[in-house]
Design a protein with these regions (language model features):
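Conserved N-terminal phosphate-binding loop of PLP-dependent enzymes in the Aspartate aminotransferase
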Residues: 1-411
């Protein structure tokens, strides 16, 4: 396995021996540092996907990697059958960092969403006193919360749910960015336990709701004794120009779901945070994870969050996001190919006019790669641009020129 293989050979290995559940951009990456990645041939690229916002702190951030290596040499895993020297420190740190009583540590974003759903239902029966097996959770159209069986049960994406039934009941789907729809459901459904929402719909193409939407929904939840559950796996940890996207409307979710950049991309770490009233419904043996809260994850997460704070990444994302969207708006004013831009902070999307060819956004991304910038389409005609938050203004402006030059080739 030490023989040097070409990109074509490595891609063929994946195609032959791996499940075909992804359609990657045809580049084989071998190294990363900051905003850059290199392929196996040594070509250097700007990374404008950031592993779906998992590497907000930049690839292989030296402080994070130093913590990872030091802890890996000392103790990697204990399970939760025993205490470990890192978990309590992390739990104190992360709850104070985000302003909650308790945290339940998990590994992946989907695991954290599943955990939040379980917490919500259990709270509904044990605290709110809903009749057994009646609890409903309201979700939004075009949501993306993961790909587990329960989560795809309330997806409207056929790729996510086709031939995976029967599906888990107990979910009510309403339009996103429509507080009146939530109000109607809360008035008509007496057994609603929670409202699960993305503050910005990332996989839907950085779809930003109207100003005031989150606060209206939060207030409705308060009035009906319903838990407001925010999935900030992709939008959280400084990506949108605030520590949390909910912070734009001063909304403090009853249950907060985090993942991805919680480790800076160094290892899988996710978390569910809430108050004592909600979190204390979980008792020994009722939920768990062998790897959740492991010593490496705990140590790495503390350092990853310290980096976000110390390097003021939220402020940087806010400032540079304004520059990026303004330049993309100028591009769209004269382009036949690019329609409009939307986003917050450094989570942005360029909408491509796909009238002539369904594959135009994909072809643009391939050409962007040739020009030294990696991005990937979502939903056929949307290109998401989300670089690591450590990008400098000079680097961002260089990338803007790459995007403009590439789009011009398709005019």
């Amino acid at each position: 396995m030490d023989a040097k293989l070409s990109a074509a050979q490595l891609m063929e290995l994946e195609n032959k021996h791996g499940a075909h559940n992804y359609h990657p951009v045809p580049v084989v990456l071998d190294k990363g540092e900051g905003v850059f990645v290199w392929d196996v041939e040594g070509k250097k690229y700007y990374d404008f996907l950031s592993a779906y916002s998992a590497v907000n702190q930049g690839h292989c951030h030296p402080r994070i990697i130093d913590t990872l290596v030091k802890q890996a040499r000392k103790l990697t895993l204990t399970s939760r059958a025993f205490y470990n020297s890192q978990l309590g420190r992390y739990e104190e740190f992360v709850t104070r960092y985000f302003g909650y009583d308790k945290v339940l540590p998990m590994n992946t974003g989907a695991e954290a969403v599943e955990t939040a759903l379980k917490l919500c239902r259990k709270w509904a029966y044990e605290v709110k006193k809903l009749p057994k097996d009646t609890a409903e959770i309201v979700v939004c159209r075009n949501n993306f919360h993961g790909r587990t069986t329960t989560i795809v049960s309330f997806s409207i994406d056929p790729d996510a749910y086709n031939n995976y039934g029967p599906f888990t009941p107990g979910f009510v789907v309403i339009p996103y960015n429509d507080a009146e729809a939530l109000a109607k459901v809360l008035d008509e459904h007496p057994h609603v336990a929670g409202f699960l929402v993305e503050p910005i719909q990332g996989e839907a193409g950085a779809y930003v709701p109207d100003e005031g939407y989150l606060k209206k929904c939060y207030d409705l939840c308060r009035a009906h004794n319903v838990l407001f559950i925010a999935d900030e796996v992709q939008t959280g940890i400084a990506r949108t120009g605030k520590l949390l996207a909910c912070d734009y409307e001063n909304v403090h979710p009853d249950i907060l779901i985090l993942g991805k950049a919680l480790s800076g991309g160094a290892c899988p770490v996710s978390a569910v945070l809430s108050c004592n009233e909600v979190m204390d419904v979980i008792r020994p043996g009722q939920h768990g994870s062998t790897f959740g809260g492991n010593p490496i994850a705990a140590a790495v997460a503390v350092t990853a969050l310290e980096v976000v704070r110390d390097e003021q990444l939220a402020d940087r994302a806010y400032r540079l996001g304004l520059i990026f969207r303004e330049e993309m708006r100028k591009l769209c004013e004269t382009s036949r190919v690019a329609s409009f831009v939307r986003g917050k902070g450094l989570l942005n999307a360029l909408i491509i006019n796909n009238d002539e060819t369904k594959d135009l956004a994909w072809e643009i991304c391939l050409k962007l790669g040739e020009n030294g910038l990696l991005a990937k389409p979502t939903h056929t005609n949307i290109i998401r641009f989300a670089p690591p938050l450590v990008i400098t203004e000079e680097q961002l402006k260089e990338c803007i020129e790459i995007i403009k030059k590439t789009i011009a080739l398709f005019e």
